[in-house]
Amino acid sequence: MKRLLLSLALAGGLAACAPSLDAPPPSACLVGAPYLTAQLFFGRSVAGRVPVSDAAWQAFVDGVMTPNFPDGFTVLDAQGQWRNPQTAEIAREPTKLVIIGVPRDAPLRARIDTVTSTYKQRFAQQSVGIVVADACAAF
């Protein structure tokens, strides 16, 4: 019984640490400096064609991603799912998730636009998912 009560107390304490979706971004960082994080979701299926190959992806990273984000980024393999807005069909495809962190005052939008528009054009993609959030970072 004591273990159950302790587990419930710890779970409640951890839940209290979760950020509120309605809370404004923190004005000061406890660690590091104010940053923006961007998550870019690159689908690798191409309608009616062979999916974007590893070699084609790496060429895109080397020629487009790296020049736009020379300080670094992280690439993860993922499996994506989304609803096509024109057909309402569910699409599932292999995905590359790219996570980028930049200082809060760095120009981000133009670089993201360059990367995503190049990917869409080069690989006949309808869209690239983008999530941008405030963060604190230290390296």
PLM features per residue range, with description:
Residues 87-139:
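Helix-rich interaction surfaces within compact, conserved domain-sized segments
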Residues 18-20:
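Bacterial signal peptide processing site
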